[in-house]
Structures are given as structure tokens and as C-alpha cells.
Design a protein with these regions (language model features):
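Structured, non-membrane catalytic/scaffold regions adjacent to prosthetic-group chemistry
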Residues: 1-206
């Protein structure tokens, strides 16, 4: 498996896992949340379910990897480059356009999750990590990063991860997820035994 960086760069580069393991790494803890998390609440007849059933499409892990900015600096980004196409090697060929500004900020090429190599189902040997962005854009089994002038409008950005607006147009690239919070106790299906004072608790994340 290799990672190719090409497009609007001065030096196209190819990295193996062994190559990347020699680079300085960064470790951080953060959430990955599915773009469809809590989506059941937007239906005309919202689903009646537990907190986990309604809001559970997220996870929190410690990720370790090479800052993407390090690799892009080594490749030498052309001044015309404003976006980066990230492509996975999965059967669906998942591909998403990422603003270059985000790639140069806090993006990681993640090699480890919770202190061990990223597992196959999580994108082994490497995946893209974009803190604060919707889950699908954190491309697994990453094989290619192409620096481009604008977004590519891949099938995953036109047929799936776009939002149909009331006027019939589609809104694209609403990539960042805002802060969210939910009440976890009492949860759906629970009943308080009698009138009185009860503690309400929950979690918040961003």
C-alpha cells in the first residue's frame, strides 16, 4: 500500500507505511461523527428511540499520525492549489474534496488508534483524519491526495453528501460539524417513580 501526493505540487511523492513511520508524529483525542447522526429527528414523525439509537453514530479515540501539512510542504504546493482530493482504495472508491486550508491546519495521516495500528475496518494502514469535519470525509484506506484548484464534485459529493434545499437546489461542502449536546439521563423509555427532584445529565461534544 502506498500514498500518492500529486496534482498542483512541485514534487509528486509516494509514501509507503514504512516511509511514514519515520516522520515526526502528533497524537490527539477527538470525535468522529457521522454526517447523518441525529438525522432521525428531522423526519416529520421523529423516531422514538434511546439516546444511543438517535445520537450514537459517533466515536471518540486517541489518534496518532503524521501531520498532513508536513507532507504537503515536502511536496511543495503550487500557489494555485486550493483544494485536495482524498481518495480511498475501498471497493466504492470513496473520494472527497477537502479545502487546502484544513489540510494545512490540523489534518493527520493517521497510522495509530488508541495506541495500536489502525485496524482494517478503520482504514489500515492509513486514513485521513480531519478534526471537526463530518465522518465520511475522514477517508479510510487512503491511497491518493491530489492538490487541485477547486472541489472535484465526485459522486460522493453530488449523489450522497449534499443537502437538498427548499428551493430545489443542493448545498454542498458543509463540512464542519458544530457543537452538539444530548440528555442521556433520563433517556427514552424511562419513567420517574414519583414527583420530586431528579438529576438531569448529558454530554456535549465538538
Amino acid at each position: 500500500h502506498t500514498l500518492l501526493i500529486h496534482g498542483l505540487v512541485q514534487r509528486p511523492l509516494v509514501f509507503s507505511l514504512a516511509n511514514l513511520l519515520r516522520y515526526p508524529m502528533r497524537t490527539q483525542v477527538y470525535f468522529i461523527e457521522c454526517a447523518g447522526n441525529s438525522g432521525a429527528l428531522t423526519r416529520p414523525d421523529p423516531a422514538q428511540d434511546t439516546v444511543g439509537g438517535l445520537h450514537g453514530l459517533l466515536s471518540n479515540s486517541e489518534w496518532t499520525g503524521v501531520p498532513l501539512s508536513t507532507l504537503l510542504d515536502e511536496a511543495g504546493v503550487d500557489p494555485r492549489g486550493k483544494w485536495v482530493l482524498a481518495e480511498g482504495v475501498d471497493a466504492a472508491g470513496m473520494s472527497r474534496s477537502v479545502p487546502l486550508e484544513k489540510c494545512m491546519d490540523d489534518a493527520l495521516i493517521a497510522l495509530f488508534q488508541n495506541g495500536e495500528a489502525v485496524r482494517p475496518e478503520q482504514g489500515y494502514p492509513m486514513r485521513l483524519l480531519l478534526p471537526g469535519y463530518e465522518g465520511n470525509i475522514n477517508v479510510k484506506w487512503l491511497r491518493r491526495l491530489k492538490v487541485t484548484q477547486g472541489p472535484i464534485h465526485t459522486k460522493d459529493e453530488t449523489s450522497k453528501y449534499s443537502e437538498l434545499m427548499p428551493d430545489g437546489t443542493a448545498r454542498q461542502f458543509t463540512l464542519a460539524l458544530g457543537p452538539k449536546s444530548v440528555i442521556t439521563h433520563p433517556s427514552f423509555g424511562m419513567k420517574v417513580p414519583s414527583p420530586g427532584f431528579y438529576e438531569i445529565s448529558g454530554i456535549a461534544w465538538s
